[in-house]
Amino acid sequence: MPQPWTVAARNLAEHVNNPIHTDAGARAAGFPSALEAGVTTYAYLTHPVVAAWGTEWLTRGGGEMRFRAPVFAGRSIDCVPTSDRDGAVTVEAIDATEPSNPRAVLTAVIDSGPPPERRAGDELDPRRYVLDERYGPDYGARAGDDLAVYGRDDVVHPAVWPAIANNVVQTGLVTGSWIHTRSIVRHHAIARRGDEVDVYATVVDRFVRHGQRAVLDVVIARSGRPVATLEHEAIVDLSVA
């Protein structure tokens, strides 16, 4: 049974590229202070799952992450897991100083199944990433996830996959503040420090709901074989009503 875990929310150095993760940018968008990057909130919520399920989840598990309300940098966040009857685990991010909770929810499963078929849409240029530094095993430690498996075994942290998808959004779809709202992440193999991966992203939907949103299918492959696949949603233009 996964156990609760508490961490202090923080933003990493690379997140200042999105103004919403700075106090000034967040206030300009109507928030009281800097929003923590959703991918870092995801990193926290994976902690109870990996502590309980280990590398099996990193190899073939996955889950759906939904961001319901902002997590503000500097706050204490409780990651509270519950087990469902079907074997899934739901982990909620709780900020005890806020009246509305949970702030975010991860529903994790031990077997996420095979890679889904790629859908038609607007294909973005392929990219290649080296899984090290900001996209390597150390992501969790920098964010506050203290599980030893990543540094000890050079296993890439699961938050790297939505972090890569976020980089695709940041550099390919937006020009100002934007917000990551949802991801479905499926793991298909372990990745380790220094691996090179090719990333193929397709914009499969655009719609307006509290801003202009984009939904991407993202395939992250090593030597032609998927390591992770994602359905990744973000508000890419906050100025659209």
Where are these regions (language model features)?
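HotDog/MaoC-like acyl-thioester-processing domains
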Residues: 1-7, 67-131, 190-241
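Short structured motifs
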Residues: 62-67, 182-188
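Hot-dog-fold acyl-thioester-processing enzymes
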Residues: 1-60, 113-182, 241
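General structural concept
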Residues: 60-61, 73
